[in-house]
Amino acid sequence: MPFVGEIFAQLKAAGSNPVLQEIRDGQITAVTGTELLELVQRARTFLASKSLAKGERCGLLASNTIRWIAMDLAATAEGLIVVPLYYRQAPHELVAMMKDSTPALVCCGDATLRDGIQQNWAAAAPHFLFDEIFARVDGIALDRPQVRSEDPVTIIYTSGTSGEAKGVVLTAANVGFMLGCTSARLDLLMGGRTSHDRIFHYLPFSFCASWIAVLTFLLRGSLVTLNTDLTKIPNDMPGRAALFPQCPPIAGAHAPRR
């Protein structure tokens, strides 16, 4: 079963237990496994209403939030190729990536991000805000997740700050392999501890290692606390979690062993 189906099964098993929480202005908002699946369902319904073809690209431009994760899982389940974009990057650099990846639509966390793109690219694909996407759309029947192992599921770009940005295409099988490696490494790091981990996560999801990490945590049934403002990490971090992911250790899980 491709990774997205495994994550959905884990969320269903979590039921009324919290799986994600985000900190915003000192306030914590949490969702259970059931509630996260409901958010995914709403986003899938919105995407299905746009009659997109399998394999079309979906830009994702937002800061780290619960809805970012729901949007990513929804687009993947609908057979789309997600193009995650770093929300702090200059609009003209993001436009260059979009012109290369040609998304059919772009999902934005807020109007400021949307306007920054549209002001720099008059011919941009349709942009939709999360508030629109997660509103309920009635009368749309959803199929089972449309993902096969060989299907491309994401295009992740280099920053483009020191040269032309380059996109790397990953299939569901590629992602599934990395999730297995990362989970195995966490088993080693935790020394056989069986209780569910509590994790504070702040690295932007548009970075590959960060995205793989948070998918791994969902698969493992961990409780993940998301920082939504990088400037507030010192206030958000204390006492929130047992693990604080960094890029090198996570990326190292995928390196070949001698």
Map each language-model feature to its residues.
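A short N-terminal helical cap/helix-turn-helix that marks the beginning
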Residues: 1-19, 38
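Conserved pre-ATP/AMP-binding loop-to-beta segment of ANL
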Residues: 15-18, 140-157, 163-164, 190-198
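Short beta-strand->loop structural element characteristic of the AMP-binding/adenylate-forming
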Residues: 59-61, 68, 72, 76-105, ...
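Conserved AMP-binding/adenylation subdomain of ANL enzymes
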Residues: 176-198, 205-258
